[in-house]
């Protein structure tokens, strides 16, 4: 317009007027450029979540148009500042359907469904986006029936509306309704297919998810990378290894291999199929800078019990400046727990603190478990206290950790705090508390708790694990008849673990007859239970019935049943050192250390407890067999290779025997160091000649 006017003035040589028009044109152009610059600046601030800076620039705009108001409202709701968004919405001089939709969607995102309904009712004109936002809001509020009503009231439905309804059904486990609706959809896009495939897999119908993917390919739907992440996960869950390989080939063909979540899904797929080497090959295809890919490989190593490799991946992430996320810490700390390596765990804890994740429930829970499993329950409690929003998993983790370490009183104090804060306990909470009663000999407290859990305010149906704990409590306290009667009265069918708890108590209290009955019940459930054979053999050996021991060993050999070999390990400077019972010392220094300790212990009056050597041989042979139990080898190695005065932490795969328990108590006094031993039952903290279990384990 301005250029035409200037041309006309030049044509008639009206130079002065053309100068005026040029000035007006320049000022108008300057205002437009300034407005555009401010709009770009506002968008940049909103993108970086600098909402207050965006508002400052917004306030400098003379007459913001509707779209700029809408952008600010969206920015507020994405930052969970709903009140500010509503105030700005009220200030708008003019509103269009987009601004109404943005405000309604913001209320839904912020969880204020009442305000969303109020705005929806006040809308002068509704679009399909308005209806879809309300359907999503109903699903977010758990109002499935209301979502259905709104969906069927919609005057016009687009593909996004259908997709929202299908996704909502799948979210609430209404898979058949979702499938029915999916088939009725007039026009399915790739999002529709992806939603249905992922939903089927997440609802444990992975086979159907794979069939649907095949249909999608037959329909020649132009795919994005998103469906492939779901399909690969479904292949792992189905399991469908060969189809997974075919999908891998298709991913390469379509050029999706190097996309972050596709690579991560492939790594996870091969790891779940126990092909961790193939996971590594996928990872090594290129240099990855995405945390999801690194985390997938770390988790894969952890899943396949290659914990040292998992920790090596964590180190690699830090070297390559890849910042770990919550999932990374969960998998990495799980590997620390499995190895019992406190040094690695503390290093990860330090990284979590630097990233501000120590108080995050997901990371905090993993830290609590790691410290508990690594023998440091005090630090576990410290971490638990710092968790900002404690979930039921947080409470259960610390209660179970206290139980493992024989801190029964602590467990019940924490349970009391949990009840006072109106946190509802679940079945795992009661399993942890009953376990604490078992380890600490709290017979009456265990009885009351067992009764309370099924009849108190927080009613919990007793599960098999609760009965197992209660049988263990009674058995350890010598109430074998009562334990047997409890099994007979169980409302659920007793499994092998319940009978093993009774059989273990029979071994502890040398009750041969009841032990034979418990073993017979186990053999009816599992004729090849090596644990039952070993416990029954121990009962016979303690009673001096060597002929019965021989018969059992012949039967085990005939049926191909192998006794689990005893092993213990220590982790020093990030490396696991494992020892097996009966090993000759790995080096002369271990042999010398063991002999030195044997002489010192004999000076203190130590005499071997031959009942722990369950073989019909001479006493000298029994002493040698006992002296080279795996935990003693591991302790000697730890004493040699750690700093004088520091604690030695040893992990063992079998329950510690009575003689080893006595020996380790004495060693802790001789060397003046704390020795922490974790067996499958609990933790033992040996210090100054005593054990934290009080000789009750």
From Swiss-Prot:
Annotated Gene3D superfamilies: Tetratricopeptide repeat domain (1.25.40.10)
Ranges for region Type E(+) motif: 574-602
PROSITE patterns in the cross-refs: PPR
Localization per Swiss-Prot or TrEMBL: Mitochondrion
Single GO BP term: RNA modification
Coiled-coil ranges per UniProt: none
PPR repeat residue numbers: 39-64, 65-95, 96-130, 131-157, 158-192, 193-223, 224-258, 259-289, 290-324, 325-359, 360-390, 391-425, 426-456, 463-497
Transit peptide: 1-36
Similarity comment text for this entry: Belongs to the PPR family. PCMP-H subfamily.
Designated name of the protein: Pentatricopeptide repeat-containing protein At5g46460, mitochondrial
Species this protein is from: Arabidopsis thaliana (Mouse-ear cress)
Record lineage: Eukaryota, Viridiplantae, Streptophyta, Embryophyta, Tracheophyta
Originating gene: PCMP-H49
């Amino acid at each position: 317009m301005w250029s035409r006017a200037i041309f006309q003035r030049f044509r008639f040589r009206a130079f002065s007027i053309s100068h005026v028009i040029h000035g007006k044109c320049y000022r108008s152009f300057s205002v437009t450029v300034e407005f555009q610059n401010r709009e770009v600046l506002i968008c940049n601030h909103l993108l970086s979540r600098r909402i207050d800076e965006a508002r400052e620039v917004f306030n400098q705009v003379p007459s913001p148009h509707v779209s700029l108001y809408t952008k600010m409202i969206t920015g507020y709701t994405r930052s969970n500042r709903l009140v500010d968004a509503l105030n700005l919405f009220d200030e708008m001089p003019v509103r269009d359907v987009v601004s109404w939709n943005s405000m309604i969607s913001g209320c839904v995102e912020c969880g204020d469904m009442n305000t969303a309904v109020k705005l929806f009712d006040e809308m002068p004109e509704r679009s399909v986006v308005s209806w879809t936002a309300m359907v999503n809001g109903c699903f977010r509020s758990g109002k499935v029936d209301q979502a259905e009503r709104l969906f069927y009231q919609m005057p016009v439905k687009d593909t996004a509306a259908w997709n929202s309804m299908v996704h909502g059904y799948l979210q609430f486990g209404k898979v058949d309704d979702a499938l029915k609706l999916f088939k009725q959809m007039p026009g399915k896009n790739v999002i529709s297919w992806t939603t249905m495939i992922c939903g089927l897999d997440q609802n444990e119908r992975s086979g159907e998810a794979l069939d649907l993917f095949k249909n999608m390919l037959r329909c020649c739907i132009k795919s994005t990378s998103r469906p492939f992440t779901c399909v690969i996960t479904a292949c792992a869950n189905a399991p469908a290894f060969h189809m997974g390989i075919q999908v891998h080939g298709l991913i390469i063909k379509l050029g999706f291999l190097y996309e972050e979540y596709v690579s991560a899904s492939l790594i996870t797929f091969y790891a779940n199929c126990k092909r961790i080497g193939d996971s590594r090959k996928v990872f090594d295809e290129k240099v990855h800078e995405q945390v999801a890919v690194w985390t997938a490989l770390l988790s894969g190593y952890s899943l396949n019990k290659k914990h040292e490799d998992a920790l090596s991946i964590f180190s690699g992430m830090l070297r390559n400046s890849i910042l770990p996320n919550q999932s990374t810490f969960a998998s990495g700390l799980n590997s620390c727990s499995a190895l019992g390596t406190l040094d690695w765990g503390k290093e990860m804890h330090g990284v979590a603190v630097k990233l501000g994740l120590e108080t995050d429930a997901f990371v905090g829970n993993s830290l609590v478990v790691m410290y508990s499993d690594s023998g440091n329950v005090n630090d576990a409690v410290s971490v638990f206290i710092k968790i900002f929003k404690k979930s039921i998993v947080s409470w259960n983790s610390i209660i179970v950790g206290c139980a493992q370490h024989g801190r029964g009183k602590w467990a019940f104090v924490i349970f009391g705090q949990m009840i006072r804060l109106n946190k509802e306990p679940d079945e795992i909470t009661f399993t942890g508390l009953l376990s604490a009663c078992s380890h600490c000999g709290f017979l009456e407290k265990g009885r009351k708790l067992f009764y309370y859990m099924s009849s108190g305010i927080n009613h919990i149906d007793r599960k098999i694990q609760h009965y197992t704990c209660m049988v263990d409590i009674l058995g350890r306290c010598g109430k074998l008849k009562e334990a047997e009667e409890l099994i007979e009265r169980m409302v659920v069918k007793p499994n092998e673990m319940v009978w093993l708890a009774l059989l273990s108590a029979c071994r502890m209290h040398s009750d041969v007859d009841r032990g034979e009955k418990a073993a017979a019940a186990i053999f009816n459930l599992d004729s090849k239970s090596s644990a039952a054979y070993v416990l029954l053999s121990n009962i016979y050996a303690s009673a001096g019935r060597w002929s019965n021991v021989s018969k059992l060993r012949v039967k085990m050999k005939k049926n191909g049943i192998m006794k689990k070999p005893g092993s213990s390990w220590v982790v020093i400077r990030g490396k696991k050192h494992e020892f097996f019972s009966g090993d000759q010392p790995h080096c002369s220094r271990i042999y010398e250390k063991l002999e030195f300790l044997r002489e010192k212990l004999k000076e203190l009056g130590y005499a071997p407890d031959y009942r722990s050597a369950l073989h019909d041989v001479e006493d000298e042979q029994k002493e040698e067999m006992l002296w080279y139990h795996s935990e003693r080898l591991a302790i000697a190695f730890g004493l040699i290779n750690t700093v004088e005065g520091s604690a030695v932490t040893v992990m063992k795969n079998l329950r510690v025997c009575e003689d080893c328990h006595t020996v380790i108590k004495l060693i802790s006094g001789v060397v003046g160091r704390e020795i922490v031993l974790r067996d499958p039952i609990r933790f033992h903290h040996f210090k100054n000649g005593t054990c934290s279990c009080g000789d009750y384990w």
